[in-house]
Each structure stands twice: as C-alpha cells, then as structure tokens.
C-alpha cells in the first residue's frame, strides 16, 4: 500500500544565522522580534499540516556580536568562554522564535505549541584553524 500523503511525517526547516540577524540591523530587541515574527508568519502554513515541524537555526552573527561586546567590556566584566557565548545567543534566538511562533499559532487558532532545545558544541582545541582565525 502506498502512502496517500506525500508530505513526510517530519519537516525540518533550517534558518541560517544571517536570516535571524542580518547585517543591516543594529540588533535591538525590536528588530530581532520583528524578524522572528515575520519568520513565524512565513512558516505558519506548515503548522497546519499533519506533521511534526522541526526548526533549527544558526546564530553566527549573534555570537560574534556577543564576543565583540565582551572584548569592549573586558576591563569591567570577565569574558565568557566561546561555548557559553554560543549557548547564550542560541537561547536568545530560540526564545525569540518560540515567542513569535506561540503568538502566530495562537492568533491563527492553532492549538500547537513551540518547544525549544539548546544543544551543545564540541570544539577540538587542537584544530589547526585556531592558528589562523578568520
């Protein structure tokens, strides 16, 4: 028997870090909330399908700006390690997207909920890329 529904049970949407934090913004909360809301509205039709929607996101520009802030403030506060910076910005991006999706779902009368999951990064300290950072 063939599956009558050609849409897979799980849909994965990957949102790049530059999509959530483009270069043309200063990074205010309002700007980031607006981008998250637009993203949620664009993806909302996928939540009406009979599937599991999984959204992943990058955070490259955000973590870069966090590190810049730390460099500028290093004489007043102790800088965080890279893994903590990544977790910090990953959490902020996830929070903004979850909040935007919850609002979009509620406004559409959709009973689904957004759930966030922070992942861990493993870095090899002997990676030769550390000799020539970009």
Positions of PLM-derived features:
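N-terminal glycine-/serine-/threonine-rich phosphate-binding loop
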Residues: 1-59, 65-72, 85
């Amino acid at each position: 028997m063939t599956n009558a529904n050609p849409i897979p049970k799980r849909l994965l949407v990957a949102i790049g870090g530059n999509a959530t934090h483009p270069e043309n913004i200063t990074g205010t909360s309002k700007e980031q909330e607006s981008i998250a809301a637009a993203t949620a509205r664009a993806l909302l039709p996928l939540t009406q399908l009979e599937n599991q929607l999984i959204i992943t996101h990058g955070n490259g520009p955000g973590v870069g700006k966090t590190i810049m802030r730390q460099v500028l403030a290093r004489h007043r506060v102790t800088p965080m390690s890279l893994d903590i910076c990544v977790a910090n910005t990953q959490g902020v991006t996830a929070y903004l997207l979850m909040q935007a999706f919850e609002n979009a779902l509620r406004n559409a009368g959709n009973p689904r909920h957004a759930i966030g999951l922070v992942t861990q990064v493993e870095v090899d300290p002997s990676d030769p890329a550390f000799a020539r950072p970009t």
